[in-house]
């Protein structure tokens, strides 16, 4: 079975199992991430009240923590839900939106990482660099200066917190601190829509809900997400029509499209090779 066969099988497994993805996420992207969860094959729930999060996460396949619209109450809810998820072996995917932009965002994300065992961190180069202490400037929630060495920053962060780190950008990099996979799928029009990084995070969460190799799950999720964008772009005339076509492409993404179009490169070997061709 090739790497792309495995990605296609994992995508089908999400559709078959329909895992519940519990989001504690930001107001800006709630509707979009709920729809993307549905389109990829999962079931979304947005629940952030401290009185219910422990009960809600117990029914979930994965937990998404996204600090985009940050508040102290939500951080406490994230910790309550995250501790319960850890007790039950439910994977947590952290989206450290705006880490490095303010001291509150940076410290809140570090608190989550120090308190909880996170399965995957998905962020842009600026956010990952800021959390790793290796450069990166974030203005608002966008990286305006990348980390000095995004891969090195991701590896440092992965080793420090015993997690998988996915740095998204022109080329996505996914590492557990030693193994490294690069994902070359995507399209520049993703940058014209707010919240696409958050949507990528929820796809990763859906994949981790049914696959315990979190490095593979994160890379597979990003490959499917980026491939859907590539398939949508020729049908679009601008950002609005691209968004509609993108949702359709995620929903209809088929195994044969994944086998033909996913582009994942294994950077862990001495001579980097396209694992899809192995």
Swiss-Prot record:
Gene Ontology MF terms in the entry: ATP binding; hydroxyethylthiazole kinase activity; magnesium ion binding
Listed EC numbers: 2.7.1.50
Residues that, per the record, bind ATP: 122, 168
Gene3D superfamilies membership: 3.40.1190.20
Pfam families associated with the record: HK (PF02110)
SUPFAM superfamilies: Ribokinase-like
Domain of life: Bacteria
Catalytic activity as recorded in UniProt: 5-(2-hydroxyethyl)-4-methylthiazole + ATP = 4-methyl-5-(2-phosphooxyethyl)-thiazole + ADP + H(+)
Cofactor: Mg(2+)
GO biological process, one term: thiamine biosynthetic process
Protein task: Catalyzes the phosphorylation of the hydroxyl group of 4-methyl-5-beta-hydroxyethylthiazole (THZ).
Family: Belongs to the Thz kinase family.
Protein name per its UniProtKB record: Hydroxyethylthiazole kinase
Gene: thiM
